[in-house]
Regions:
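Intrinsically disordered, low-complexity segments enriched in Gly and acidic/Ser/Thr residues
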Residues: 170-266
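Short loop/turn segments that connect beta-strands within beta-propeller blades
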Residues: 35-38, 75-80, 128-131, 174-177, ...
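A short beta-strand motif characteristic of beta-propeller blades
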Residues: 1-6, 37-44, 81-88, 134-144, ...
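Structural motif
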Residues: 29-32, 68-74, 115-127, 166-173, ...
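Repeated scaffold domains used in trafficking and secretory/extracellular systems
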Residues: 7-19, 47-58, 90-100, 140-156, ...
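Residue position within the beta-strands of beta-propeller blades
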Residues: 23, 62-63, 108-110, 163, ...
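Non-cytosolic head/periplasmic domains of membrane-anchored proteins
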Residues: 3-110
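Acidic, serine/threonine- and glycine-rich low-complexity intrinsically disordered segments
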Residues: 92-209, 213-214
């Protein structure tokens, strides 16, 4: 054990990027920050925390709730408040998802609200360097999704953002200002999503066939992989060019060209299956032990 720390949370949420980790209690007013040396700070937000996002550069963004207003605050890992964005819920909607860039200078947020009795959803980009200083509320781009609810946004890498809607996924490129790369529109409701630095994965259930259909796209929005499975996989991951799927006992690993690299049934069950940096090394965890395995 390199270090350990204790803290009190009721409903746990966390965000990790590089060597930085942030942990918060949803509805509480504390954010705990960590790096590889241990706990850095217990940040008192004064308002209830709804979401957090941490960057490799050492910044934490948090959505805070205050009656009819919500705030998106940025803190250093030591707890200094760097900026505040104030959003009126009845005008802007609720910030349902946020993600901060690796350098901490850009933030994307998905908002959902009601306007004239109809659902409205949007994705907004903020810039906190010199470019953003010249823009109103530091907004450098916004995209309207109408009644399509965007439930999650994330930075895949330093310059690529993905926004996941119910039946549409958008890829954006951002240096200082965002540009739409491609809208991926599908004729089904997306059940699960997963991602890596260079790929995104979509899963939906074919109820007629009682099978899951898994599709993987690159950051240009081109489909590069598709599989149908009746294994009822519960977990999906992408690491480099490896696509990992597993359930309580069964695990399969594909390469992005569709070839099976590994397929096995673990009789002791699977709690987690974690890819390591080396292409053929993994951490296998079950309820009784943890084991590092190397594929031939």
């Amino acid at each position: 054990t390199l270090w350990n720390s204790t803290y009190e949370v009721n409903e746990f949420t966390m965000s990790m990027s590089g060597n930085n980790l942030a942990v918060a209690d949803i509805g509480g007013s504390k954010i705990y920050t960590f790096n590889t040396n241990g706990m850095i700070e217990s940040i008192n937000t004064a308002l209830p925390v709804l979401q957090i996002s941490v960057s490799k550069a050492g910044y934490v963004a948090a959505v805070l709730e205050d009656k009819n207003v919500e705030y998106i605050n940025m803190y250093s890992m030591k707890g200094e408040k760097i900026y505040t964005i104030k959003k009126a819920i009845d005008i802007d909607g609720l910030p349902v998802s946020i993600s901060i860039s690796e350098d901490g200078e850009k933030l994307v947020a998905a908002f959902t609200g009601i306007k004239d009795g109809n659902i409205k959803s949007s994705v907004v980009f903020y810039n906190f360097n010199e470019v953003g200083q010249n823009e109103n509320e530091r907004v450098v781009g916004g995209f309207d999704y109408g009644s399509t609810i965007v439930g999650r946004v994330e930075f895949l890498n330093a310059t690529t953002v993905v926004a996941y809607g119910e039946n549409k996924v958008s890829l954006y490129h951002i240096n200082e200002y965002p540009e739409l790369i491609k809208d991926i529109e599908v004729d089904y409701n997306i059940d699960k999503v997963f991602s890596g630095e260079s790929y995104i994965g979509l899963v939906h259930r074919d109820k007629t066939e009682a099978k899951d259909i898994i599709a993987v796209y690159n950051t240009s929005g081109n489909k590069i992989f598709t599989k149908t499975s009746d294994k009822n996989y519960t977990h999906y991951k992408i690491a480099d060019s490896r696509i990992i799927m597993y359930n309580e006992k069964e695990c399969v690993i594909y390469s992005t060209n569709g070839k099976i690299k590994f397929e096995y049934t673990f009789q002791d069950g699977i709690s987690s299956f974690i890819p390591l940096d080396k292409d053929n090394e993994y951490i296998y965890i079950n309820k009784d032990y943890i084991r590092k395995i190397k594929l031939r």
